[in-house]
Design a protein with these regions (language model features):
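Generic beta-strand/beta-sheet core signal
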Residues: 32, 120-123, 303-306, 330-332, ...
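Short, well-ordered loop/turn and helix-capping segments at boundaries between secondary-structure elements
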Residues: 183, 205, 222, 247, ...
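Short, glycine-/Ser/Thr-/acidic-enriched flexible segments
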Residues: 23, 160-162, 180-182, 201-204, ...
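Class II aminoacyl-tRNA synthetase-like tRNA-binding/catalytic domains
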Residues: 2-208, 218, 292, 397, ...
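Hydrophobic, well-ordered secondary-structure elements that form the walls
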Residues: 303, 339, 391
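Hydrophobic face of alpha-helices
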Residues: 105, 109, 113, 210-217, ...
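Active-site pocket scaffolds in enzymes
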Residues: 346-425
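Metal-assisted phosphate- and nucleotidyl-transfer catalytic regions
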Residues: 216-333, 355-382, 423-425
Length: 425
């Protein structure tokens, strides 16, 4: 048997020679590695002792059902300590998560190659990460000209600006599997570093991107996955979601005073949450209290046509400029993808960034550099385009049936039983 074969794929009585970690359980001994977890049955007097717990071993024998009947075994090296931090705090096998991610990366690359996309790479260290009030970038200063000449910068929150610059240079269908960083809380669904699959179609409408997302997600969340999703995926507008969850028309309440009055009249939020002067803060409070719980009951759903103030990088809907060409895909309340019909007007984009900057100042948030290189590219000219970012970690969580990102991202931060943050790698 080669080391990459699976025990459960072998016929009974097949000869087995493999390696792994020896684990003592209340029921006996077990062998574990990234590919195999199986019970061991030792015959004769040559059996492991307590000191062999967690040792790396080589074993040989024959399979009988789910048990490996051991005829020979030897210790390669004994463990000098207990389970590592990498092993702690998870509920699924590490190997299962690693293999699922590798399989998804292969699936994604095959998916896009079949559709004439080109895989690209863009810098993770950037001068201007974007101005979004609700995203906190991770600072990263480098010293390109020596210790006395620091160059402040950031780890990108998304490869969006760089990929759009490639669209301005003539790229038409591009995708990227990117590691990105966003400062903020550590939760079951959030980690400061995570994986995004982002792609763009020049000269094509947003519906083409929505179709891509539907096909790729349904291929990944197939019938054998923990949470299958089948096409067609339902589509509803954000206006409809707010009507169903809150009982009012969000598009008639696009300024802070009007929305605050409506929220108070309908008693949708506690009084202290209504004190904010910012429309988007009121809206996101409604998201937490009402919209997210409602969306969680809808299964797999595309929420489209978001209010224009919530889409700084998206173009407005020509049929109703109160809304933007933006969608999000949710599965059982888990936000998976966020897509735009991309704004290409450089002056309008600058004005939106400047509005963001004023909003950051009003909230006491740090000022961020204006993305001048991106704006310069827009002035050069960007074709009408559509794009999306899909959260790979969350998609894998749904595929494997886990509620925590740590089960699919081995190095994700996590909190112990006392609520203390475990040190990062």
């Amino acid at each position: 048997m080669t080391d990459t074969q699976r025990l459960d794929r072998l016929p009974d009585c097949a000869s087995v020679q493999t390696r792994g970690r020896l684990v003592q359980t209340e029921h006996g001994w077990r062998l574990r590695n990234l590919h195999i977890t199986c019970d061991l049955a030792f015959s004769g007097g040559d059996r492991p002792a307590a000191r062999d717990h967690l040792a790396l071993v080589e074993v040989g024998g024959a399979r009988e059902g789910a048990v490996l009947q051991v005829s020979t075994w030897r210790v390669i090296t004994r463990a000098g300590s207990g389970p590592t931090r990498l092993s702690a705090g998870r509920t699924t096998e590490l190997g299962r998560a690693i293999e699922a991610r590798a399989a998804f990366n292969r699936r994604a690359r095959n998916f896009f190659e079949a559709r004439d996309f080109i895989e690209v790479e863009t810098p993770a260290w950037v001068r201007a990460p974007g101005t979004d009030v609700h995203l906190a970038p991770v600072g990263a200063t480098v010293h390109l000209d020596g210790a006395h000449h620091p160059r402040p910068g950031y780890l990108h929150t998304s490869p969006e600006f760089s990929m759009k610059r490639l669209l301005c240079e003539g790229a038409e269908r591009i995708y990227q599997l990117a590691r990105v960083w966003r400062d903020g809380e550590v939760t079951a669904r959030h980690n400061p570093e995570f994986s995004l699959l982002e792609w763009y179609r020049a000269w094509e409408p947003l519906d083409a991107i929505i179709d891509d997302v539907e096909q790729l997600v349904c291929q990944t969340l197939h019938a054998e996955s923990a949470r299958p999703v089948t096409a067609p995926i339902r589509r509803v507008t954000m206006q409809e979601v707010v009507w169903e969850a809150c009982g009012f028309d969000i598009l008639e309440n696009l300024n802070a005073d009007a929305l605050r009055e409506t929220v108070r009249r309908l008693e949708l939020l506690p009084p202290h949450l209504c004190e904010t002067p910012h429309w988007d803060d009121l809206f996101f409070a409604l998201v937490v209290e009402h919209l997210d719980p409602h969306i969680a009951t809808m299964g797999a759903v595309f929420v489209t046509d978001w209010p224009a103030p919530l889409a700084v990088l998206a173009r407005k809907n020509p049929d109703d400029p109160r809304t933007a060409e933006r969608f999000e895909l949710y599965v059982d309340g888990v936000e998976l993808a966020n897509g735009f019909g991309e704004l290409t007007d450089a002056q309008e984009q600058r004005e939106r960034f400047e509005e963001d900057a004023r909003a950051r100042e009003a909230r006491g948030l740090p000022a961020l550099p204006m993305p001048e290189a991106f704006l310069e590219a827009l002035r050069f000219g960007m074709p009408p385009s559509s794009g999306v970012a899909l959260g790979v970690d969350r998609l894998l969580m749904l595929q494997l049936g886990t509620d925590t990102i740590r089960d699919v991202a081995p190095f994700a931060l996590w909190r112990d039983e006392a609520g203390e943050l475990v040190d990062w790698p």
